[in-house]
Amino acid sequence: MQYILGIDFGLKRIGTALVNTIDRFPSPFRVFAVQNNLQQAVNTLFKDLKQAGYELVQIVIGFPHFHYQSSIQVSIHKFVELIKTRFNVPVTLIDESGTTSEVKANLQELGLKNRTFKKAKDTLAATLILERFLNQQKPN
């Protein structure tokens, strides 16, 4: 089965989610520590996906849209180049504005505590990034 990988990039952690191209229901995958080494994070992600047997056809990465160039944007561009080299699949950047706030609001609405938010925010934000991407792909 073929999958699309969603990524919520952070300087400390990278949240990931997957959706298969048939069912199209995104679900959280896992969080990867960056530890100041993007190449190692990309290699670990590649290894884990390969071991789990996921065949990727696309990667979608959340990208913050500011009116100025920020350090996080520079880091994401470096990350994208590493991802493209390692995975050899199309990479799409998608606006991630408000994903973390939306995740927090959804968890609070469910009555879950901030501790749950801290543990789940990265993978759930990646899930939202995938949902936004899939919604953009729907024909009008």
UniProtKB/Swiss-Prot annotation:
GO BP of this protein: rRNA 5'-end processing
GO terms for cellular component: cytosol
Class of this enzyme: hydrolase
Molecular functions (GO terms): nuclease activity
Keyword Hydrolase recorded: yes
EC number(s) from the headed UniProt entry: 3.1.-.-
InterPro entries linked: RNaseH-like_sf, YqgF, YqgF/RNaseH-like_dom, YqgF/RNaseH-like_dom_sf
Superkingdom classification of source: Bacteria
Protein's UniProt keywords contain Transmembrane: no
SUPFAM superfamilies the record matches: Ribonuclease H-like
SMART domains: YqgFc (SM00732)
Family per record: Belongs to the YqgF nuclease family.
Main function: Could be a nuclease involved in processing of the 5'-end of pre-16S rRNA.
NCBIfam families referenced in this protein's UniProt entry, alphabetically: RNAse_H_YqgF
Protein name, per record: Putative pre-16S rRNA nuclease
Lineage of source species: Bacteria, Bacillati, Mycoplasmatota, Mycoplasmoidales, Mycoplasmoidaceae
